[in-house]
Structures are given as structure tokens and as C-alpha cells.
Amino acid sequence: MKLPATTQNRVRTTTIFCWIVVTITMSVHCSPPPPDEGGYIEQLLEDRENKDNFFSEGTDSPVPLDRRSWMLPVRYYEPNLTYRVPASLRISENQPIFEVPTSTGQFRTMQQVGTLEFMLNGEPLTLSALMELPASETTRLFVPFRDQTSGSETYPAGRYLDLDRTATGIYDLDFNRAYHPTCYYDEQYDCPFPPPENRLDAAVRAGERLPAENEQQFPMNTPALLKQEAGGDLPNN
């Protein structure tokens, strides 16, 4: 039976409308809104400047006075929105608890909250999201990682990301905010190493990086500890 022309038009209109609604709904739930590039970069640069000021002048700066001349200002990769991606947190069924070795030869107790799943430069990747124990509540996720720049362009032990918990399970994974642990500046700090599953087979050229090659100086105990922790697979620096 052939529908009248007006009915056919109504069906087409309804179908198109429904498709638009579904598409918009999926976009809203599957990814954060596109960033305001100008405002985002401006805020990022301001935060970097504030960190430099604190590291240079703050009474609680983790950078020893005799190292500030070559460690500061902190060196960064240029802001790059390619390295700001949405990630979905898949909650771990058992949320295992395990011990993580640290830069001082100690251990920290961590719990795997879940796995962050994301795409970076067209490649599917994952990172374990952790919480240090004991903790009264999980308000932030700790994401330590190493990548293909570790040991050459960035600190051999890796870098960190901190993420505020979300109700949706969708996270703004911004590697432009990846930072070096405090033990990079002073070996007296105790810093957990990234777990094996958080060693990315990709170069993350975003966030904090090492000073120029001829200025690289590491705390004396760092290379030996890293070599022991990583089974000898780290380059010498």
C-alpha cells in the first residue's frame, strides 16, 4: 500500500529527527565537549607559569636551591590538543590491591580502580587508574605512566597524571598536564613507579620534559634504582 505524499514526508522528517537526536545523545555521553582552544591554552600556560613561580620562590618547593639554575624553569612540550583525549573508565571487577616499588626502595600499597580506555594518534591504548591506600574515599585517580620518551626526552621513571572522579565514567585525559614526580628534583622524595601495564608503546610528546640534553643531571641514586625496577631495560642517562 502506497502512503500519501504528506505521510511519506512526515515519516522522512520523523526518521531524520530521530537520527539527529540519537547522534547528539551519543556524542554527549561518549565524549566531553570540544575544548575552547584559545581559552584552554591560555589557562594551561598560566598554570605552568604559576608552577614555575612556586618552584622558584615557594618555601615548600621540591627543587633544592643548588639545582634550580638548571632544573628551572620547568621545560615543557608545546601545548598540543592531539594529546587531550576522552577516556572511558572500565571499573575493575575485583579492584586488586598490590604493592608498588618506589624510588627510595620502599613500597606503596595501591588499588586498581579501573582501566582507562582511549585512542591516541589513532591507536587504542589503556592505562590503569590507581588509588593509594589507605584512603577514606576515591575522589581522584592516580595515573603514573612511562612511554617511549622516558629516559631520553622525559624522566626515566615516568610521569604522572591526576584525574578528578566523574559520575559519567568519561574522563578528560590531558597529557599536556603530565608532570614529573618530585623525586626527579630531589632523590629524598619517595615516588611510586608506574606498574608494568602502564608502560605505553607510544611516544607521548606532551606535558613536562627534561632540560636540554647537555643539562640533564639526575640524582645519583636514580639510574640504579630504575634499572633494578625495570629489569635493566632502561637507557643510561
Task: Indicate where each model-derived feature is located.
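Acidic, glycine-rich flexible loop segments
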Residues: 144-179
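Bacterial signal peptide processing site
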Residues: 31-33
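Bacterial N-terminal signal peptides that target proteins for export
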Residues: 2-18
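Solvent-exposed coil/turn segments that connect beta secondary-structure elements
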Residues: 90, 121, 146-148, 176-178, ...
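Mid-length scaffold segments of soluble, non-membrane domains
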Residues: 93-157
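C-terminal motif of bacterial Sec signal peptides marking the signal peptidase cleavage site
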Residues: 26-29
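N-terminal secretory signal peptides
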Residues: 43, 48-115
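Extended, aromatic/histidine-rich regions of cofactor-dependent oxidoreductases associated
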Residues: 151-153, 170, 178-237
